[in-house]
From Swiss-Prot:
It comes from Gallus gallus (Chicken). One of its GO terms (cellular component) is cytoplasm. PANTHER family: GSK3B-INTERACTING PROTEIN (PTHR12490:SF4). Transmembrane segments: none annotated. Residues 1-23 are annotated as: Disordered. This is GSK3-beta interaction protein. The gene is GSKIP. Pfam families: GSKIP_dom. Belongs to the GSKIP family. The keyword Zinc does not apply. One of its GO terms (biological process) is regulation of canonical Wnt signaling pathway.
Length: 139
């Protein structure tokens, strides 16, 4: 019977795979808030006038800042941390330490409180998706 590797090589390969899995687990444990912020922006950009991750304010493992302009033309700087999202200023690329706005668990909750137009656009998009699913299931 031919083998591609000896049993000793197989043992060494298994050990390196375990080490690799452990390293992947360690790396996955560390969050990059910039990536989280980009995902938030991509998720709801369709429902606001403008939204982007700040290039002026610092991003780190534990914090990122997102600039949001609602359809009503309200401008906000939003802080994203493990605690959630909260408005930290009423203009782009700013922070105001005197503001004590509450954290929201999701971007949907935050935008729901800031923008009635967001609520309408998001609700309409959801309705269209549900109607499309219904049509697909009937055909």
């Amino acid at each position: 019977m031919e083998t591609d590797c000896s049993p000793m090589e197989l043992t060494n390969n298994t050990e390196s795979e375990e080490d690799s899995d452990y390293r992947d687990f360690e790396e996955a444990d560390v969050k990059d808030m910039r990536l989280e912020a980009e995902a938030v922006v991509n998720d709801v950009l369709f429902a606001v006038s403008n939204m982007f991750v700040s290039k002026t304010l610092p991003c780190a493992e534990d914090v990122a800042y997102i600039n949001v302009e609602t359809r009503e033309r309200g401008r906000y700087c939003v802080e994203l941390t493990d605690s959630g999202l909260r408005v930290v200023a009423y203009d782009f690329d700013q922070t105001d330490d005197s503001l004590q706005n509450p954290y929201h668990e999701t971007v949907y909750s935050l935008l729901d409180t800031l923008s009635p137009a967001y609520r309408e656009v998001f609700g309409n998009a959801l309705l269209q998706r549900l109607e499309a699913l219904k049509r697909d299931s009937q055909s």
